[in-house]
């Protein structure tokens, strides 16, 4: 609350109802009857939760920039941008890069809040800067384990917890030692990639090695897959059916 602008505080005080997480709502000096905690899972109930207060002034709390992998994207998709008034703050990407001295435009962001940790793999290459948006306090340990398994055991890993909050903490670890102690649930993981000499990289280009797939062994060989996909030249959002 102390870090909010006067304009933002005025908006919150004027709102008929304020939605947010338990952590966010606990920071507000606002009467409890005006506060609404998000249900879990959130997305299936998002529209009905907001429409319950149709015609009233609804305020939604977000961390950082709502339009950077945040609730603002879901609200715009569900209700249209014309119904929103977004008050952004610095994103977790900007804050993390500021702490680490990284260039924002040269840092790859991977969101695994609702995705498997292996989603990070295609972004890993020697000297890459990767910022992982975490699901919870266990995510850093999963990331460190993935790095060790993927041939990036020498990478520098920094866990940034509670950014711009009084409890902010940066923990520097290396992917090589075993495990990472459980910390705060509100965190992002910054990886400065260092590859092992013998690592086998998983890329986004066609022709992943056969070992990257699990199954019964009935798999079109890498060279054929590479040539086929190159000829088809798929674009983002398109769907390919492999019928055989």
Question: Can you describe what each PLM-predicted range is?
Answer:
Residues 1-87, 94, 117:
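Class I S-adenosyl-L-methionine
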Residues 10-11, 52-53, 79, 100-103, ...:
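Solvent-exposed alpha-helices and their adjacent loops that cap or buttress functional pockets
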Residues 12-16, 32, 127-128, 186, ...:
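Short, well-ordered alpha-helix to beta-strand connector turns
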Residues 17-19, 59, 108, 131, ...:
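Conserved beta-strand elements of the Class I
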Residues 55-58, 126-218:
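A contiguous loop/helix-start segment that scaffolds small-molecule binding in enzyme catalytic cores
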Residues 92-128, 135:
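Short, glycine-/small-residue-rich phosphate/pyrophosphate-handling segment
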Residues 219-236:
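Conserved alpha-helix/loop element of class I SAM-dependent methyltransferases that forms part
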Residues 237-244:
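Conserved class I S-adenosyl-L-methionine
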């Amino acid at each position: 609350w102390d870090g909010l602008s006067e304009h933002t505080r005025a908006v919150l005080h004027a709102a008929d109802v304020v939605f947010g997480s338990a952590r966010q709502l606990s920071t507000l000096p606002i009467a409890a009857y005006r506060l609404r905690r998000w249900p879990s899972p959130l997305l299936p109930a998002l529209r009905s939760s907001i429409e319950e207060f149709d015609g009233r002034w609804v305020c939604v709390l977000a961390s950082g920039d709502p339009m950077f992998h945040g609730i603002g994207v879901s609200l715009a998709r569900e209700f249209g941008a014309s119904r929103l008034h977004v008050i952004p703050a610095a994103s977790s990407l900007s804050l993390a890069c500021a702490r680490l001295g990284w260039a924002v435009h040269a840092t790859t962001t991977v969101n695994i809040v609702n995705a498997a940790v292996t989603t990070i793999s295609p972004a890993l290459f020697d000297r890459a800067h990767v910022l992982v948006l975490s699901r919870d306090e266990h995510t850093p340990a999963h990331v460190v384990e993935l790095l060790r398994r993927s041939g990036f055991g020498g990478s520098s890993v920094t866990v940034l917890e509670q950014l711009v909050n009084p409890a902010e903490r940066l923990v520097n670890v290396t992917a090589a030692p075993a495990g990472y102690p459980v910390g705060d649930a509100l965190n992002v993981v910054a990886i400065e990639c260092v590859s092992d000499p013998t690592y086998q990289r998983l890329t986004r280009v066609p022709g992943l090695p056969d070992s990257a797939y699990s199954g019964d062994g009935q798999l079109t060989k890498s060279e054929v897959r590479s040539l086929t996909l190159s000829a088809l030249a798929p674009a983002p959002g398109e769907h390919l059916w492999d019928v055989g």
